[in-house]
Design a protein with these regions (language model features):
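Helical "lid/coupling" subdomains associated with nucleotide-phosphate turnover
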Residues: 2-187
Length: 187
């Protein structure tokens, strides 16, 4: 996470939890193989669901020699919701205490693959009490994967390195420095 207030970096850190932990939780709690747990999370899960259909079963086909898997929807959603609440509350507790008071914080951007899950934005908004967004890039003919929240952290780090590199004074070669002594420009 990174916190900017008034254009200044105020806090940053890492909560070493994410979407893969949700899939692991589903596997540990239900015995469903990890590949199927991941698929159930992505296709059937809802982080903000308070489904009244407590016994509704959701299913995912087994691949190869794996059996089909099934789980009650409310159990799946509760596993997802519990882990995401933990993640969001860990981030919130790591931030300065007055971050969300008054008009200091205008919103939260969600990144990573788990941010694409149903209900994640609503759950995050409930925890942080502010508007929730997902980062998007200005369209300039760039490949569509650059707009994908799963890649925004890596792309952001690359972009940050590019900006830092552009701000460094350009170093001239040895020959350019020697010629510079005589008033010639190195081209």
């Amino acid at each position: 996470y990174v916190l900017y207030l008034d254009g200044q970096l105020v806090a940053s850190g890492c909560v070493p939890l994410g979407g893969d932990h949700i899939s692991n939780d589903i596997t540990l709690m239900t015995g469903i193989p990890l590949a199927q747990a991941e698929l159930l999370k992505k296709t059937e899960g809802d982080a903000n669901s308070f489904s009244g259909k407590t016994n509704e079963m959701v299913r995912v086909r087994g691949e190869g020699n794996m059996k089909d898997a099934a789980i009650e929807r409310n159990v799946l959603n509760e596993i997802i919701r519990s882990r995401l609440l933990e993640i969001f509350n860990l981030v919130k507790s790591s931030l300065p205490k007055d971050t969300f008071k008054g008009n200091r914080c205008h919103g939260v951007y969600l990144c990573g693959g788990a941010s694409l899950m149903r209900g994640v934005g609503e759950l995050a908004s409930h925890v942080f009490g502010v508007a929730i967004s997902r980062p998007t890039l200005v369209k300039n003919g760039a490949p569509s994967y650059l707009d994908d929240p799963r890649y925004c952290t890596a792309i952001g780090l690359i972009r940050y390195a590019q900006i830092l590199d552009a701000e460094l004074p350009q170093q001239r070669s040895w020959l350019g420095r020697v010629l510079g002594l005589f008033g010639r420009k190195n081209s």
